[in-house]
Swiss-Prot record:
MF annotations from Gene Ontology: iron ion binding; iron-sulfur cluster binding
Gene Ontology biological process: DNA-mediated transformation
Protein name (Swiss-Prot/TrEMBL): Ferredoxin-like protein YgcO
Purpose of the protein: Could be a 3Fe-4S cluster-containing protein. Probably participates in a redox process with YgcN, YgcQ and YgcR.
Superkingdom, taxonomy of origin: Bacteria
SUPFAM superfamilies on file: 4Fe-4S ferredoxins
Keywords: Electron transport, Iron, Iron-sulfur, Metal-binding, Transport
Family: Belongs to the bacterial-type ferredoxin family. FixX subfamily.
Domain named 4Fe-4S ferredoxin-type: residues: 45-74
Organism placement in taxonomy: Bacteria, Pseudomonadati, Pseudomonadota, Gammaproteobacteria, Enterobacterales
């Protein structure tokens, strides 16, 4: 599947928000596992999430506990990814 065919309509507010403090080991697990590459560390060592390219697959929810992500929900109706196969 080519992700170039998929369409994103980005919401103004993020649907994934990291906790204020995330263990480095958990952050590295998210950085390595996210298929969209949304996660990175800031120079200060904080977890950064670029929610705009999210595939809404839920991998991050499976890899961490509820204390890692302050918020995870699907984008509002009409926003997020639209998969286009072909």
């Amino acid at each position: 599947m080519s992700v170039a065919r998929n369409l994103w309509r980005v919401a103004d507010a993020p649907h994934i928000v990291p906790a204020d403090s995330v263990e480095r080991q958990t952050a590295e697990r998210l950085i390595n596992a996210c298929p969209a590459g949304l996660f990175s560390l800031t120079p200060e060592g904080n977890l950064r999430i670029d929610y705009r390219s999210c595939l809404e697959c839920g991998t991050c929810r499976l890899l961490c506990d509820e204390s890692t992500l302050q918020q995870w929900r699907y984008p509002p109706s009409g926003f997020g990814i639209t998969y286009r196969f072909g």
